[in-house]
């Protein structure tokens, strides 16, 4: 029965590594990396989950269960969720997402190849009864909360308010010594904070059409392959058939930095690898990564790496002695 419940809520592909009482540890199937999930079954219908992924994607598809509400908080990394309707939503570090799991997803991936976060999973009918019994003096209508945040079919994605972020931080701090009573109080606190959150805090959903997300991903991969190539934004828009404003905002939403900040970082990483080799002059390395002016290259390198190219080369030579 317990295994059937796990598969119903979390999918059939997870591997149980350890179980004792309300605690379960799972290995998640990932593409090109590893993932694990810790689950605390606090009450019937109320789960607290910690997730960590060092991978590009998780291969477990979310089940379609209309009564399940998922409250995700991203601590580190980026989370991309592709909906079968053909749109993409993104959760960034410090963001919170509320989603009804009756809205199917076809895949989940991590654009930065890393993700760490926590989630509260509520089976609304069971959770409503459990919380009412555990906290009889608290007025909390989970269906009304779901309607307020998600409406008739949307997901809610926004930056955490400072107090919600602080409450999740408490859960992260206690992860390895978590007690059920403490966890349950923090879960209740988060639900009440969401209930009482001002209307102006419930902003729009940063999602993008599939062709935009795929175009931005292609741009990202092209930069990784050819960091020395610098194209004006107009040419990038023409190449990927995306408008300037959307291209800039989508790239930052997915990868957490501007196009040209990412380009500069890739160039400096390539330059650092060449400097460690020791064979080329700094001027030649600057030209290799797209800089005609060695002084501008040195300034850019210092901005990313914290030291000048010559200092970087010298420090690497000293380490090899």
Indicate where each model-derived feature is located:
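Short hydrophobic/aromatic patch on the recognition helix
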Residues: 247, 251, 296-297, 301
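Terminal helix-turn-helix DNA-binding modules in bacterial transcription factors
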Residues: 217-225, 229-230, 234-237, 253-295, ...
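Conserved phosphate-binding and hydrolysis motifs of nucleotide-dependent enzymes
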Residues: 256, 290, 301-302, 306-309
């Amino acid at each position: 029965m317990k295994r059937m419940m796990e598969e119903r809520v979390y999918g059939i592909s997870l591997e149980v590594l350890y179980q004792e009482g309300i605690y379960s540890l799972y290995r998640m199937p990932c593409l090109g990396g590893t993932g694990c999930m810790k689950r605390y079954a606090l009450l019937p219908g109320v789960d607290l989950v910690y997730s960590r992924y060092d991978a590009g994607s998780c291969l477990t598809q979310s089940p379609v269960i209309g009564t399940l509400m998922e409250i995700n908080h991203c601590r580190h990394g980026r989370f991309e969720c592709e909906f079968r309707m053909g749109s993409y939503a993104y959760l960034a570090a410090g963001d919170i997402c509320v989603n009804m799991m009756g809205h199917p997803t076809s895949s989940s991936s991590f654009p930065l190849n890393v993700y760490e976060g926590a989630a509260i999973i509520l089976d609304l009918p069971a959770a409503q009864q459990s919380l009412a019994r555990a906290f009889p003096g608290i007025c909390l209508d989970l269906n009304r909360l779901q309607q307020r945040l998600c409406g008739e079919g949307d997901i809610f994605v926004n930056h955490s308010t400072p107090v919600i972020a602080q409450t999740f931080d408490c859960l992260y701090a206690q992860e390895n010594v978590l007690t059920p009573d403490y966890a349950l109080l923090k879960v209740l606190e988060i639900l009440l904070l969401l209930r009482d959150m001002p209307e102006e805090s419930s902003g729009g959903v940063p999602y993008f059409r599939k062709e935009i997300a795929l175009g931005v991903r292609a741009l990202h991969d092209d930069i990784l392959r050819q960091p020395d190539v610098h194209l004006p934004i107009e040419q990038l828009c023409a190449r990927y058939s995306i408008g300037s404003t959307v291209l800039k905002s989508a790239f930052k939403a997915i990868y957490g930095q501007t196009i040209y900040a990412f380009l500069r970082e890739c160039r400096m990483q390539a330059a650092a690898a060449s400097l460690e080799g020791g064979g080329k002059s700094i001027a030649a390395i600057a030209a290799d990564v797209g800089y005609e002016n060695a002084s501008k290259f040195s300034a850019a390198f210092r901005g990313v790496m914290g030291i000048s190219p010559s200092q970087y080369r010298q420090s690497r030579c000293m380490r090899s002695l």
